[in-house]
């Protein structure tokens, strides 16, 4: 209803605790399945029910951060080690982007050939919104390159 009424230029959907897997791997897989289904449902809803947004919307699915490469020395009740968010590896994330002008068959980067970094997300969002130059020229972002610049 909110999307139909307001047809937002930018919508952020936070998928809380999707990555929690320490106590029950089956629940973790269920969380991933629900998140995947929810994202697909939102995309399909936009494309099929909101003509003003259909074929005029870009959706990005990205985590808020990665994890350190090496665990810390804190273990939970199931003897799983904890991971912080402080080394360069914590900036490595996946992203999935769909929308107009984006090749649906394009797949770039992998664990051994990384493309982009979490610092490229703000310029990417700004580019989609049409204000990248203003954002980059503000001096408040760590990178001037969007993911589109890197592909």
Regions found by a protein language model. Give the residues of each.
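Active-site His/acidic residue clusters
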Residues: 1-41, 45, 75
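Membrane-interface soluble catalytic domains
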Residues: 29-30, 36, 40, 44-55, ...
